[in-house]
Structures are given as structure tokens and as C-alpha cells.
């Protein structure tokens, strides 16, 4: 296992629970300064502090996994993922089968994103250290969840900073279909995990969409950067008078059109508009009572 020794006086943030160690705090790396993987962290007096993941090319050199001397293996990931899954299941509506299972540092799994879309999982391994543990994570997910397939979509600028290559493809089970149908708070959506934005859907906006339903009645609404039309559909479900869904991407608007139909909303009750949101906002004056911006 890699061993990291901190400079004198730099152990404080880690001892207080900070999940990151920056490169400037490190005195020495033993076992391979250019290697990524699991590393033990010690202070300058050789006291063990924590166990984390080393990213040799990142300014955030270490991301802490645990402050306990526990093995970083399949059982470790099974425990962490089970805990995060239990938290979600305790608050989610039964009419929801799409949500984030693992949210990086928020679930003490730095560099790992796992999103559930109905019977499929989409993963992102966004740090060099977590990338090294890909097979272990996939094994834990396969054992815990009866997913039809596990798909990887690791891409974006953050990978350049970590010194790892983008990776997109099937990790286990079946490949996802071209479009997956999901349900969120009773509304249905088709999503494209391969070509869509992020992992296929903006799961982090679920609560904001639900709030919009409660304030949309009889209002004229401009949904900027509308993508697959999720805010528009929630607004129509809340009784909105009129919706304009604005996006610069034609494929996104086509996806929104399908989702409107899937939820029983006639396209005639809303307008799908291709254009630049910033330009349109300057020109529309006070025509819209609500303007979701995501």
C-alpha cells in the first residue's frame, strides 16, 4: 500500500474531517509517487491518520475514504453503498425509479458517481484513485443491486486534471437500450444515457422540479436550457397556463417532445423553441411569470 507523510503542522484539517489533502501538504510519498491507488496517511511523527485514494497528477493529491483502519475491498464498498442506498430509499417517493445512489464525497466515496435509471446503473469514475478500484466497485454493485446492466460514462475535463482517459461502455450485464424509460414522482421520461448530458438526466433537480409543480398554476413559464423538458412537464402537471421550452440543441428538444407525449401533454399546449437562452431572455421582457434556469 502507498504511504504518505504530511508536512509538520498539516495534519489538522484531516484530523478534523476534511476529505481532501492538497499536494502542498505532502512531505513524502512512498511506494510510487506516480502511482494511483489506496494510500495510508501519516503525520510527520509517524502517527497513522487516515486512509485515502492517491491521485498523483491532481492538486487534490489525496481524497480520504476512511478514518478507520479498514480494508478497502468489496465489503467496504458494499457497506458504503448499502448505507447511501438506505438513505435514498427512506425519503424517495415510491413513484421514483431514478436517483443518485453514490454522490462522491457526499457519501464518503470520493470520485464515484452511481446513478440508477430504472433497471440500469450508470457510473462515473472521476479520480485516478477510484479508477483503479473500478472492478471492485462494479463487483459490489452487482452483488447489491439486481441491475440489468452497469454502464460507465466517465468523461469531462476533470479527467484531464486526474490524468486518466475518458471511458464509456458496458461494465457488467446488458448494454442499455437507446432510450430508457424512468419515473420520477409519477412523471415519466425517456433518457439517453449514451449521448445525453451528464449521465442522462439531471437527477439533482428533482426537488426543484417538485417545487415548481406547487407554484406553476395558471402561470406562463419559460423553461430555459430545457434539455429533455423535465421542468416543463412538472409545470404542466401543476397546472401551468403556458410553457415555452427553450434549448439550443435540436436533439434535446426532440427528447422533450417525446416526454411531453409520454405524460399525456399535447405539444400544442407548450412551445418547443430552439435558440440561445441569454439572447431570448433579453428580448422577452416581462412576458413570463416564472423562468427556471438550470
Enumerate the predicted regions with their spans.
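A short, charged
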Residues: 75-79, 83-89, 95, 146-163, ...
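A short interface-forming secondary-structure element
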Residues: 118-130
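Non-catalytic substrate-recognition/targeting regions of SAM-dependent transferases
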Residues: 102-109, 113-115, 132-202
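Short hydrophobic-aromatic micro-motifs
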Residues: 21-22, 41, 50, 121-124, ...
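Extended active-site and interfacial segments that coordinate phosphate-rich ligands
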Residues: 57-63, 128-135, 141
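Rossmann-like S-adenosyl-L-methionine
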Residues: 174-294
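Non-catalytic accessory regions of SAM-dependent methyltransferases
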Residues: 1-118
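Short amphipathic alpha-helical segments
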Residues: 73-80, 129, 133-137
Amino acid at each position: 500500500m502507498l504511504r504518505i507523510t504530511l508536512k509538520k503542522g498539516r495534519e489538522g484539517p484531516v484530523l478534523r474531517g476534511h476529505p481532501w489533502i492538497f499536494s502542498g501538504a505532502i512531505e513524502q510519498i512512498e511506494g510510487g509517487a506516480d502511482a494511483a491507488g489506496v494510500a495510508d496517511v501519516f503525520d510527520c511523527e509517524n502517527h497513522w491518520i487516515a486512509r485515502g485514494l492517491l491521485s498523483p497528477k491532481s492538486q487534490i493529491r489525496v481524497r480520504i475514504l476512511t478514518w478507520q483502519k479498514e480494508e478497502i475491498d468489496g465489503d467496504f464498498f458494499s457497506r458504503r453503498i448499502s448505507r447511501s442506498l438506505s438513505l435514498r430509499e427512506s425519503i424517495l417517493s415510491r413513484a421514483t425509479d431514478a436517483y443518485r445512489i453514490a454522490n462522491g464525497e457526499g457519501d464518503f466515496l470520493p470520485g464515484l458517481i452511481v446513478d440508477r435509471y430504472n433497471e440500469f446503473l450508470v457510473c462515473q469514475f472521476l479520480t485516478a484513485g477510484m479508477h483503479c478500484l473500478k472492478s471492485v466497485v462494479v463487483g459490489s454493485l452487482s452483488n447489491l443491486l439486481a441491475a440489468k446492466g452497469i454502464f460507465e460514462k466517465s468523461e469531462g475535463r476533470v479527467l484531464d486534471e486526474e490524468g486518466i482517459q475518458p471511458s464509456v461502455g458496458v461494465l457488467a450485464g446488458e448494454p442499455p437500450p437507446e432510450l430508457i424509460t424512468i419515473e420520477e414522482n409519477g412523471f415519466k421520461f425517456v433518457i439517453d444515457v449514451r449521448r445525453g448530458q451528464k449521465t442522462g438526466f439531471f437527477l439533482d433537480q428533482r426537488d426543484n422540479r417538485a417545487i415548481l409543480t406547487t407554484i406553476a398554476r395558471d402561470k406562463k413559464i419559460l423553461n430555459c436550457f430545457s434539455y429533455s423538458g423535465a421542468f416543463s412537464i412538472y409545470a404542466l402537471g401543476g397546472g401551468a397556463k403556458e410553457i415555452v421550452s427553450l434549448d439550443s440543441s435540436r436533439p434535446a428538444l426532440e427528447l422533450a417532445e417525446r416526454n411531453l407525449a409520454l405524460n399525456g401533454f399535447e405539444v400544442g399546449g407548450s412551445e418547443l423553441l430552439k435558440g440561445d437562452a441569454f439572447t431570448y431572455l433579453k428580448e422577452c421582457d416581462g412576458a413570463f411569470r416564472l423562468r427556471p434556469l438550470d
